[in-house]
């Protein structure tokens, strides 16, 4: 599966675990770690977040959660 897209439409339902690296998740059920760089406590993760910044997940910052 393409790591930069989500397998469901806007408002759809999907399973998004810690291994999910989609950058534009629109799933209402996807609330945690949708961005590879998004912190687990972030509640805005399902709203079109993208990872920006340096190389590697530790150097990147989530556009929604920073």
UniProtKB/Swiss-Prot annotation:
Entries under InterPro entries matching the protein: Metalthion_dom_sf, Metalthion_dom_sf_vert, Metalthion_vert
UniProtKB keywords: Acetylation, Copper, Metal-binding, Metal-thiolate cluster, Phosphoprotein, Zinc
Binding site for a divalent metal cation 5: 35, 37-38, 51
UniProt modified residues of type Phosphoserine: 33
Biological process according to GO: activation of protein kinase B activity; cellular detoxification; cellular response to cadmium ion; cellular response to copper ion; cellular response to reactive oxygen species; cellular response to zinc ion; detoxification of copper ion; energy reserve metabolic process
Positions that bind a divalent metal cation 3: 16, 20, 25, 30
Region span, Alpha: 31-66
A GO-annotated cellular component: inclusion body
Residues annotated to bind a divalent metal cation 4: 34-35, 45, 49
Domain of life per record: Eukaryota
Residues that, per the record, bind a divalent metal cation 2: 8, 14, 16, 27
Physiological role: Binds heavy metals. Contains five zinc and one copper atoms per polypeptide chain and only a negligible amount of cadmium.
Protein name: Metallothionein-3
Organism: Oryctolagus cuniculus (Rabbit)
Taxonomic lineage of the native organism: Eukaryota, Metazoa, Chordata, Craniata, Vertebrata
Underlying gene: MT3
